[in-house]
Amino acid sequence: MARGLDLAPLLLLLLAMVAGFCTAQINCTCPTNKMTICNSNGPGGVCQCRAIGSQVLVDCSTLTSKCLLLKARMSARKSSRRLVNPSEHAILDNDGLYDPECDDKGRFKARQCNQTSVCWCVNSVGVRRTDKGDQSLRCDEVVRTHHILIELRHRPTDRAFNHSDLDSELRRLFKERYKLHPSFLAAVHYEEPTIQIELQQNASQKGLRDVDIADAAYYFERDIKGESLFVGRRGLDVQVRGEPLHVERTLIYYLDEKPPQFSMKRLTTGLIAVIAVVAVALVAGVVVLVVTNRRKSGKYKKVELKELGEMRSEPSL
C-alpha cells in the first residue's frame, strides 16, 4: 500500500506532462500565417511552423514573405487542401497565379518559369517585368520594388469620410495589424470614393527586422478580399469614427528601382487596335469632308448656273 502511495506523485507528474504536451500541441499555431504546418518538435518542445509547399521554417512573430505564401497557396490548390479560399482574380500583374521559386530566405528568385518551360524575370514583389522567353532567358538580379500604390474604391456612403480620420485609421491598421513601420507609409490620399495608400521603402531603409512593404501590401490585399492569412481572424474590419469602410475595388501598382524591360512585342496587339481605330477615324473624317465639300460645291454651281440663265434671259437695252 505504501508503495502505491509512493507511485502516486510520479503518476500525477506523468499526467501533468502528458496534459502539458497535449496543450502545447493544441496551442501550437502560427498566428500570422494559417498556411503552415506546426508542431512542438523544436528544442524544449518549442512550437515550430513550416510553410506549406516549401517546408521553410517561418517566423510567426511577423509577416511571412509573399513568395512563400504564393507557393503555399499553389500547393494547397494542388493537394485540394482547403485552407484559404483561392481568389479567381489574378493578383500578379495580368499573368495570374503561378508556383514561384523562392530562395532560402523566402524571397522571389529573379527568374520564374512555369511547367511549359516558359520563363520571365520578376521584381521583389514577384510581378513580371520582362517579356516571356524560354529557359535560356537570363535574369541577373531581383529588382527591388520601392514604391507601392494601393488604390481603393469604397462603397457609397451618406457623407464622405474625414480625410484626417481616415489617414489615422489606415496608419494604425498598417502599424498594428501588419507590423509595418510608420515611416514606410508615405501618404494617404482621399477623393471620394477613391482612397490611395502610398508605401515607400528603399533597400537601404529596410532593417533586418522590418516588414517588407510587398508583404504588407499582400496581406492587406488578402484581407480586403475576405481571405485573411491571420489565424482566427476574418476579413478586414475598418471603421472610421464608427463608420464602416467597405471596399468595392482594389488596384495595386508597383514601381521598381529600375524601369521594366518590355519590348514592343508586348504592345503589338494594343498598338494594332489603336492604329486600326485611328485609321478608321481618319478615313471617316476624310469621307465626311469630301462629301461636305461636294455638297457645298454642288450648291454653288447650281446658283451660278441659275444666275447665268437669268442674265441670258434678261432683255438687252
Curated annotation (Swiss-Prot):
It comes from Rattus norvegicus. Its main location: membrane. The chain crosses the membrane at residues 271-291. Keywords: Disulfide bond, Glycoprotein, Membrane, Signal, Transmembrane, Transmembrane helix. This is Tumor-associated calcium signal transducer 2. Belongs to the EPCAM family. One of its GO terms (biological process) is negative regulation of epithelial cell migration. Disulfide bonds join 67-102, 113-119, 121-139. Residues 25-270 are extracellular. Residues 64-139 form the Thyroglobulin type-1 domain. Residues 1-24 form the signal peptide. It comes from the Eukaryota. One of its GO terms (cellular component) is membrane. Pfam families: EPCAM-Trop-2_C, EpCAM_N, Thyroglobulin_1. It is found in: Membrane.
